[in-house]
Amino acid sequence: MKKFAVFGNPIAQSLSPTIHQMFADQVGEKISYEKILAPEDGFVEAAKAFLAQEGAVGCNVTMPFKLDAFNLAKVDDQAAKDAQAVNTLMNGDRGELLGFNTDGVGLVNDLLNSGVKIKDKHVLLIGAGGAARGVISPLLKAGAATLTIANRTKAKAEEVASAASNPKVDVVALEDIATIAPHIIINSTAASLSNALPCSLNDGVLQHCEVVYDMVYKNSPTRFMRDAAELGVKTQIDGLGMLVEQAAEAFYIWTQKRPDTSDIVKRVRDIVEQSEKRN
């Protein structure tokens, strides 16, 4: 049996074991997948101990350990290099620990699965944290014409843009986003968790907007999605599909088997809705 895990702090609410078990059942893999709560200063030791076990193939890494995982691993994956963050670790054939970042691929695949065209579109990315860093190179690889980063602290956005080192990436102050007139707006901040808006949706920022994407997911549309819909944006998407798609990419890296995610996204959404009703 192949062993996997997800490390985080907190980790109790993680859907990763459920999602990966669905993948395994679908493709005929026998796996175990556990949630591991690592101490904030003890991730490296905990991950090494898990990955040294017989049968251990790899693990996922969530907040706040993605930078620790990046520093721990041998990283050839461009998205992980750009993000300076790793969310997927795998034992290599030569005893080395390999690191990947599947967040951006997860976002791009979810957008494409939802019928969103990325090629030649102008993208506005709200936020400049780890979630934002991980999606920049995959969005550009998917053909985005430009990608503009807006953040409450403009200097942080400039730092992320500089690290991306691509002429298609630029920065705008959060209060000046109306000058961008993007086709796609992506919220990578946690604003929606507290029912706040990540940015103002007034002053013309939506004049050409076709899609808003919120990396947060709930059992109902976030305020960001609702407000955009009321202001005429045709398509609003939450981050649940991204969660499933980034997991599918990790599963493929580990097993070389690519699961069909369409039914799984629906099943996971049902679980989220039932869980939130109970709470």
From Swiss-Prot:
Pathway: Metabolic intermediate biosynthesis; chorismate biosynthesis; chorismate from D-erythrose 4-phosphate and phosphoenolpyruvate: step 4/7
GO terms assigned for molecular function: NADP binding; shikimate 3-dehydrogenase (NADP+) activity
Function comment: Involved in the biosynthesis of the chorismate, which leads to the biosynthesis of aromatic amino acids. Catalyzes the reversible NADPH linked reduction of 3-dehydroshikimate (DHSA) to yield shikimate (SA).
Enzyme Commission no: 1.1.1.25
Binding positions (shikimate): S14, L15, S16, T62, N87, D103, Y217
Oligomeric and partner information: Homodimer.
Binding positions for NADP(+) per the UniProt entry: G127, A128, G129, G130, A131, N151, R152, T153, K154, A155, K156, M215, G239
Keywords: Amino-acid biosynthesis, Aromatic amino acid biosynthesis, NADP, Oxidoreductase
Annotated gene: aroE
Similarity remark: Belongs to the shikimate dehydrogenase family.
Domain of life: Bacteria
GO BP terms, alphabetized: amino acid biosynthetic process; aromatic amino acid family biosynthetic process; chorismate biosynthetic process; shikimate metabolic process
NCBIfam families: aroE, PRK00258.1-2
GO cellular component: cytosol
Active site residues according to the UniProt entry: K66
Protein name, UniProt field: Shikimate dehydrogenase (NADP(+))
HAMAP family, per the entry: Shikimate_DH_AroE
Catalytic reactions on record: shikimate + NADP(+) = 3-dehydroshikimate + NADPH + H(+)
Species name: Alteromonas mediterranea (strain DSM 17117 / CIP 110805 / LMG 28347 / Deep ecotype)
